[in-house]
């Protein structure tokens, strides 16, 4: 029992370290990608090829003054960034990064926790992220923050419906809620080939769930200064920032797990295949941000309720018919 607990703690520490490092360098890579697409140089001056830029940004944020605006709800104001960060981290408790490896004569699963109802927990953890957004907007005592928080709440709740329906089709197709079993069932064929519409719906909603362009209405600079981020700076802002990029990694890892065979690929390098698939999705997020204009808020909500939800319901009915009948 104690050995199992130690193994879980070691897995958790390794995953957290990798996620924080990946999120830090995602900010650097995104700036490089956007600069190249916009015919600019990007941040290339700090260290060789700019590789120390994330470290410099972290030191800058760490050294900033611990400022708190007047008349804020102090406890909630400080709690909101933590909620955004930790809800993103919790998702990786369920993600299987690979199969089984043998270390010191002991078989180790490359997954922190294999829960029989993993898909349900995924939806639950992703739903909790909305609290960080709405509480940050409400506690900041700022009209821009409040409007951004309300926008983010409405957007995330609206797009969770088609996302949940798309994941339900995966459950119907595989007959299990365990993420590890879903990956193992994709050893010979990925679910993207049998559930392409479900993947498209999931991928579109993942942009809305992460508040990324073209669905970044909660923090639209031209309208809301910085939205629910407006009154945050220093490490509190860094917590929101890390939460956003870890959330991008999370939705990319979920897409890889549920639709693209997880760690399966040619050769005996499961972790590398998993990482490569996730990296491709992360690059698409960056590419879309650099190339697509932002939706209007009414277009965003109309698209979610009038287009995605009906298509997701119809797709679920068709999948259920061909699976169960």
From Swiss-Prot:
Q: Which GO terms describe its biological process?
A: aerobic respiration
UniProt KW Translocase keyword: yes
Give the bilayer topology: Multi-pass membrane protein
* Keywords, comma-separated and alphabetical: Cell inner membrane, Cell membrane, Membrane, NAD, Quinone, Translocase, Transmembrane, Transmembrane helix, Ubiquinone
Superkingdom classification of source: Bacteria
GO MF term set: NADH dehydrogenase activity; oxidoreductase activity, acting on NAD(P)H, quinone or similar compound as acceptor; quinone binding
Provide the Gene Ontology terms for cellular component: plasma membrane
Q: Give the Enzyme Commission number.
A: 7.1.1.-
Subunit-level organization: NDH-1 is composed of 14 different subunits. Subunits NuoA, H, J, K, L, M, N constitute the membrane sector of the complex.
Q: Which family does it belong to?
A: Belongs to the complex I subunit 1 family.
Question: In its UniProt entry, what is this protein called?
Answer: NADH-quinone oxidoreductase subunit H
């Amino acid at each position: 029992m104690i050995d199992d607990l130690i193994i879980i703690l070691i897995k958790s520490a390794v995953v957290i370290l990798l996620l924080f490092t990946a999120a830090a360098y995602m900010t650097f890579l995104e700036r490089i990608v956007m600069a190249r697409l916009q015919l600019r140089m990007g941040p290339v001056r700090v260290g060789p090829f700019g590789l120390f830029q994330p470290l410099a940004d972290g030191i800058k944020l760490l050294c900033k003054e611990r400022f708190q605006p007047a008349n804020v709800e102090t406890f909630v104001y400080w709690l909101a960034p933590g909620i955004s960060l930790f809800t993103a981290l919790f998702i990786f408790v369920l993600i299987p990064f690979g199969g089984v490896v043998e270390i010191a004569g002991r078989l180790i699963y490359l997954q922190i926790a294999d829960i029989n109802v993993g898909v349900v927990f995924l939806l639950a953890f992703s739903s909790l992220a909305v609290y960080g957004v709405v509480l940050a907007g409400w506690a900041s005592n700022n009209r821009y923050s409040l409007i951004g928080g309300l926008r983010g709440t409405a957007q995330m709740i609206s797009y969770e419906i088609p996302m949940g329906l798309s994941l339900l089709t995966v459950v119907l197709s595989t007959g299990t809620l365990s993420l590890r079993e879903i990956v193992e069932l994709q050893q010979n064929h990925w679910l993207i080939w049998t559930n392409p519409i479900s993947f498209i719906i999931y991928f579109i909603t993942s942009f809305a769930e992460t508040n990324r362009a073209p669905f970044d209405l909660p923090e639209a600079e031209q309208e809301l200064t910085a939205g629910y981020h407006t009154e945050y700076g220093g490490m509190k802002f860094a917590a929101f920032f890390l939460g956003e990029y870890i959330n991008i990694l999370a939705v990319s890892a979920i897409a890889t797990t549920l639709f693209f065979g997880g760690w399966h690929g040619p050769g005996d390098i499961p972790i590398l295949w998993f990482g490569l698939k996730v990296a491709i999705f992360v690059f698409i997020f960056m590419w879309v941000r650099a190339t697509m204009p932002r939706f209007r808020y009414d277009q965003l909500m109309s698209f979610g309720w009038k287009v995605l939800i009906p298509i997701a319901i119809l797709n679920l009915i068709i999948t259920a018919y061909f699976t169960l009948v």
